[in-house]
């Protein structure tokens, strides 16, 4: 850990990369982040890359040494590249002094308790090994297994749903940001960085699971796809496939859940996951998990409610930011509050605060004649004060 920077040129670790001829004369040098985000300019290579899984490091470095073809200039746009991730695996091996497979096993898989996860199918207990198939000539045909090699860094793990759920759970544990002990094996802030899209793209004509128009913003982080649909629901996912197999997983940080599906047919699609999503979000109407309420937000909630009822000058001096009465006069706010609380009638219950973040939230005041919705947000000062306050009956 800490032995490289994402902005280091790849040639610092793989000298053969210094000789590559870029597509354009103004191309920037490929760095490690380019490989992670699929923006190195390499062409999409899924069909070809799958068949390179077993090849040794010498083949990978020979490919670079002989010269590679580019489809784009680096840092210009996203294009999926298995070769880029094979190079990342090679860098991990060189920097760590051990095969990337061993480094990942020791530093990621074992700490997560993923003891039933393998790189090489020969090491999987025979009774547990899933056999791959393809559909050909109207019948199922066995697909020969591929051995592990240099290209395994693109996604050559063999695992179970139970084991892989530990990995997905680890990603979900990064949310929300908090001050709890950070036990690793990767820092929560680093996981959230992995889940942040680069080069986001708008799919304006996208449709939802029912075929209705629903635009999607989509991008790629560090080995993860991130998409947010027209309903504001963000999913972080990746699919993968090799001859004989297919997999798909997605997790929703704001909901605290993950969905995964594995299949032993060549390029199995994500349909099972999509059906589960429909059940959760449309049928069950799953709600987002609530953010914890900060101490200052909880304190200001009680004070805001008291101010709206009493307009105590001393209290206002304590909690009102300098802009609040400049944006709308104290007199206007007082008159509006009196009208709202008179219409609502006697207060019966104040509901729990729902926080948008550590300095902004909403709550409902239940009264005899209905409810009052209250929204407020606090300043960035050391002692945060109320800079915006809205309420309606």
Task: Describe each model-derived feature in a short phrase.
Residues 1-10, 88-93, 256:
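Active-site SXXK
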Residues 215, 335-381, 386-388:
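Surface-exposed, charged secondary-structure patches
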Residues 22-236, 241:
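Short, surface-exposed loop or secondary-structure junction motifs
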Residues 5-23, 112:
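Short, glycine/proline-biased beta-turn/loop segments that scaffold the active-site neighborhood
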Residues 199, 206-208, 233, 261-332:
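Short, gly/Ser/Thr-rich active-site loops of penicillin-recognizing serine hydrolases
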Residues 237, 248-251, 255-265, 373-375, ...:
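Short, well-ordered beta-strand elements
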């Amino acid at each position: 850990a800490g032995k490289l920077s994402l902005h280091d040129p790849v040639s610092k670790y793989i000298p053969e990369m210094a000789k590559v001829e870029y597509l354009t004369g103004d191309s920037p040098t490929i760095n490690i982040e380019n490989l992670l985000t699929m923006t190195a300019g390499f062409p999409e290579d899924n069909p070809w890359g799958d068949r390179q899984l077993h090849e040794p490091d010498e083949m990978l470095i020979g490919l670079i040494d002989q010269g590679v073809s580019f489809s784009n200039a680096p840092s210009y746009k996203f294009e999926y590249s298995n070769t880029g991730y094979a190079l990342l695996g090679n860098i991990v091996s060189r920097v760590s002094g051990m095969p990337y497979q061993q480094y990942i096993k020791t530093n990621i898989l074992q700490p997560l308790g993923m003891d039933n996860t393998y790189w090489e199918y020969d090491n999987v207990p025979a009774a547990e090994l899933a056999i791959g198939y393809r559909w050909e000539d109207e019948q199922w045909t066995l697909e020969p297994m591929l051995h592990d090699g240099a290209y395994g860094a693109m996604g050559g793990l063999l695992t179970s749903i139970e084991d892989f759920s530990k990995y997905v759970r680890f990603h979900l544990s990064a949310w929300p940001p908090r001050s709890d002990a950070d036990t690793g094996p990767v820092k929560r802030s680093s996981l959230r960085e992995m889940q942040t899209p680069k080069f986001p793209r708008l799919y304006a004509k996208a449709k939802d699971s029912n075929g209705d128009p629903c635009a999607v913003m989509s991008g790629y982080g560090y080995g993860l796809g991130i998409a947010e649909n027209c309903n504001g629901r963000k999913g972080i996912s990746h699919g993968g496939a090799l001859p004989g197999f297919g997999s798909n997983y997605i997790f929703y940080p704001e909901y605290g859940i993950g969905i995964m599906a594995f299949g032993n047919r060549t390029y199995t699609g994500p349909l099972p996951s999509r059906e589960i999503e429909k059940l959760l979000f449309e049928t069950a109407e799953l709600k987002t998990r609530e953010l914890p309420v900060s101490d200052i937000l909880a304190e200001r909630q009680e004070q805001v409610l008291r101010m709206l009822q009493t307009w105590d000058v001393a209290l206002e001096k304590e909690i009102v930011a300098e802009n609040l009465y400049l944006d709308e006069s104290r007199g206007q706010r007082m008159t509006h509050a009196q009208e709202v609380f008179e219409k609502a009638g006697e207060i019966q219950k104040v509901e729990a605060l729902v926080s948008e973040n550590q300095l902004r939230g909403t709550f409902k005041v239940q009264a005899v004649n209905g409810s009052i919705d209250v929204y407020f947000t606090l300043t960035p000062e050391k002692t945060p004060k109320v800079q915006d306050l809205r309420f309606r009956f």
